[in-house]
Amino acid sequence: CVQAEDVQYDGTIGDAPTQLNISNSAIRNMTVGLLARSFQITAYNNIISDCKSYGAVFSQGGNYTLKQNTIANYWRYSQRSTPAFFMNDFVNDGTANVHIPLNITVDNCIIYGNNDNEIEKDLLDSLADTYSFRNCLIKVDEKVTPVSVIPAFINTFKNQDPQFEDYAKYDFRLKDTSPAIDAGDGALLTVPELNTDIDGNIRPQGAAPDICALEKK
């Protein structure tokens, strides 16, 4: 597990978060792939896969920017009831839940797995938070996470199989027929390191970037 947290150690809840940059990394076969609490993280070109509970957790607020990541949870060794992606914006101080602002941007990412719902949020004050999912391929149960009526989900591909080459063998390259190919937004490639994928291949290879960490060659 990559764990990053800064809550209550100095007696202040939700003060200026600490910075962590994760790029071109593969995280797999953990209980939780990425666990962040009141932190500041940028994550580019990462593959988080096959975790016993959560793929990525962003809790107790914080500032997070995720671009060109593949979060794919096909854990098969026991039953999993938790989603691949979870976020919340509060901490309990022993008396009540205290809101900590959550700012999260998810661009050109896959969030998928073998559960019906792979994105969940538990927000104390959603109007005080900012979050967006742009040009992402996601798996959700509308009864749990009604993305169709949440403006923060922009140009998302819902419940379309990303068609990985062989996720059972951790091969998360896209098949030729994947809906994620050329489905990203090139305007979201805002830093030079996004011009190549996790394997160092040029991005984009086609008319637009693929939605994922691995660009289809």
Please identify what each model-predicted range represents.
Residues G33, T42-R173:
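Predominantly extracellular beta-rich ligand-binding scaffolds that present long acidic/polar faces
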Residues N155-K216:
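C-terminal accessory segments
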Residues D15-A16, L20-N21, Y54, N97, ...:
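Short, charged low-complexity intrinsically disordered segments located at boundaries
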